[in-house]
Curated annotation (Swiss-Prot):
Organism the protein comes from: Methanocaldococcus jannaschii (strain ATCC 43067 / DSM 2661 / JAL-1 / JCM 10045 / NBRC 100440)
Lineage of the organism: Archaea, Methanobacteriati, Methanobacteriota, Methanomada group, Methanococci
Family annotation (Gene3D superfamilies): Trafficking protein particle complex subunit 3
Protein name (database record): Uncharacterized protein MJ0207
InterPro entries, A to Z: NO_sig/Golgi_transp_ligand-bd
Length: 151
């Protein structure tokens, strides 16, 4: 297998160590799985979100509602996150994403390898005990919208 065959068109470094790790992992998934990268990113992201929720709660963070989660996630500086809860769904707008391989590093590949859908489900399920499904409208390097449906 030839390593590094997905082209990186920007020379800018990632903004943080977690960003570098997640972007590298996402691009590697894309290289290995092709079109299955988004499904694997969703699954891996859900476990990452669960573990992040456990970590946060064990370190004194309290989550009573979606706005508490929005504040916490914005503190991580992974992206600009806006969350609004309606009756049966949570609408999440993600912009200025520091986890996007296309936006940050200029990686050029078809499709997506975004951890946000899974990460949000894992985190919210762990902290608020919601049972969620999702629908994603991903626009790499722009604003992505994820609708989390309450089950």
């Amino acid at each position: 297998m030839v390593l590094y065959k997905i082209r990186r068109s920007k020379n800018d470094p990632c903004p943080s160590i977690p960003s570098a790790v997640i972007i590298g992992y996402s691009v590697g998934l894309k290289l290995i799985t092709g079109h299955g990268a988004q499904s694997l990113s969703n699954m891996a992201g859900s476990y990452a979100g669960k573990e992040l929720g456990i970590y946060a709660m064990n370190n004194g963070y309290e989550f009573k509602d979606i706005k508490d989660i929005e504040r916490f996630l914005n503190q991580l500086d992974f992206a600009k996150i806006e969350m609004n809860e309606e009756e049966d769904e949570i609408i999440v707008k993600i912009s200025k994403c520091n986890l996007c391989p296309k936006r940050i590093c200029g990686y050029e590949f078809e499709g997506t390898a975004c951890p946000w859908g899974g990460l949000l489900i894992g985190f919210i399920s762990e902290t608020l005990k919601y049972n969620l499904g999702y629908q994603m409208n991903l626009k790499p390097a722009e604003t992505c919208i994820i609708k989390l449906k309450k089950k």
